[in-house]
Amino acid sequence: MSFTLAIVGRPNVGKSTLFNRLVGKRLALVDDQPGVTRDLREGAARLADLRFTVIDTAGLEDVTDDSLQGRMRRLTERAVDMADICLFMVDARVGITPTDLVFADILRKRAGHVVLAANKAEGAAADAGVIEAYSLGLGEPIRLSAEHGEGLNDLYTHLMPLADAYAERAAEDAPETDVALDEDSGDMEAALRMPTANKPLQVAVVGRPNAGKSTLVNQILGEDRLLTGPEAGITRDAISLRTDWVGPEGDVIPMRIFDTAGMRKKAKVQEKLEKLSVGDGLRAVKFAEVVVVLLDAAIPFEQQDLRIADLAEREGRAVVVAVNKWDIEENKQAKLNELRESFERLLPQLRGAPLVTVSARTGRGLDRLHKAVLRAYEVWNRRVTTAQLNRWLAGMLEAHPPPAPQGKRIKLRYMTQAKTRPPGFVVMCSHPDKVPDSYNRYLVNGLRLDFDMPGTPIRLWMRGQNDANPYKGRKKAPPSKLRKHTDGRRKD
């Protein structure tokens, strides 16, 4: 997983010019007029062998009102919060301004890593400005000329050790997903890996700040519990907290909880802020095995809640929906029926996922949440034998044969499970491109019902008959060689 670099600084110091040079395209507007970049622009950057995400921000303006400049400033501060590294650019020809001093102080407080760059530093005329940049207290400035491409080697030297550190931490925190299976029955025994101290269950709790997410996490951790952390997470917005979550029957789950700023309340700002808020949730989801989507019982299933739940499904993570503040709900049964109906209607792709009511304030319902998380994790690891699948497929075909589009009969010949975490299945058939979406949904819903896989994402790939054996060349191959099973048409 690559890091994210935010280029920040006051207007017209050359941020967009450097952004365009790193991305290799003119994606950002460049002009001599200050404040041309009014939005956040994100691109895939390349610097020698480094690959990372770069964000071009609006200029940091020393304003506090609700004018356009004020919104640009808040948007930039939001980008600083979500970035792993901030490249703070100053103009070496102009020198350090009072605005630079103010926002250097902001960056010291808000940013995890700050790299200082003095741009427009070509020629002796910039020497005084480069020396003056030391007064910011952010270390030695890099001499850059974004327009001419000078100083990029020095930037690479600064970023390389940080990139290595993020890659190492990402490897430690990344969950094992899309696990390939082969024909050996031994894989069935290994499919469900129980959490251990070295490989704890990774859970992300996501939701709006006023949904009670922090209170719930504190209840799970326990006020007096000695934690092996907090550890810095992959982003400054995410920290992972380790604990042993004791269940109602005394069963203990070694667990790492990814706590993140999550999905913030809709601000009076443009859509980019909302997009960045969901971006925080994305980081938490990517490092989780089970995602707990926390809702407020008073205002459940808002647009942001639906987006993050759908995101977890698309990322292939197990999902548990928890409804908080249940202790102050008066008509509990009617509300529960309403929640279940809304869940089935708004999130059909997660049909059957656990929906648990809790009170983060009192701790009631945590036992149910504990069971639901374990159950979701078990289903996410589910393994079905090839013999069972093909007997099941024969019954499904007999009950509802596939259609014959344009008179072409579709034959579904063979089925096997190719992956787990989440479960993924390959069907060998004729005319895989002709199988309609409705028939794929019929098969996925049948798998979910008949093999007891409620709520978990299920992947289904239709493959042609050119390679009659879906395990060919794969039995002793590394997982990366299994992409041939997922390059075909995917139906969820």
Curated annotation (Swiss-Prot):
Reading the lineage from the top rank, the first entry is: Bacteria
Q: Residue ranges under compositional bias (Basic residues)?
A: 472-492
Tell me which positions the record assigns to the signal sequence: none
InterPro entries in the record, alphabetically? G_ENGA (IPR031166), GTP-bd (IPR006073), GTPase_Der (IPR016484), KH_dom-like (IPR032859), KH_dom-like_a/b (IPR015946), P-loop_NTPase (IPR027417), Small_GTP-bd (IPR005225)
> What keywords tag this UniProt record?
GTP-binding, Nucleotide-binding, Repeat, Ribosome biogenesis
| PROSITE patterns tied to this protein | G_ENGA
> Which residues are GTP 2-binding?
207-214, 259-263, 324-327
Q: Where is the EngA-type G domain?
A: 3-167, 201-381
Give positions of region: Disordered: 462-492
Tell me which residues make up the KH-like domain.
Answer: 382-468
A GO molecular function term, named singly, is: GTP binding
Q: What Pfam families does the entry give?
A: KH_dom-like, MMR_HSR1
GO annotations under biological process? ribosome biogenesis
Chain residues that bind GTP 1: 9-16, 56-60, 119-122
Assembly and partners are described as: Associates with the 50S ribosomal subunit.
Q: Which PANTHER family match?
A: GTPASE DER
**Chain's role:** GTPase that plays an essential role in the late steps of ribosome biogenesis.
UniProt family annotation: Belongs to the TRAFAC class TrmE-Era-EngA-EngB-Septin-like GTPase superfamily. EngA (Der) GTPase family.
Stated name of the protein:
GTPase Der
Q: Which organism is the protein's source? A: Roseobacter denitrificans (strain ATCC 33942 / OCh 114)
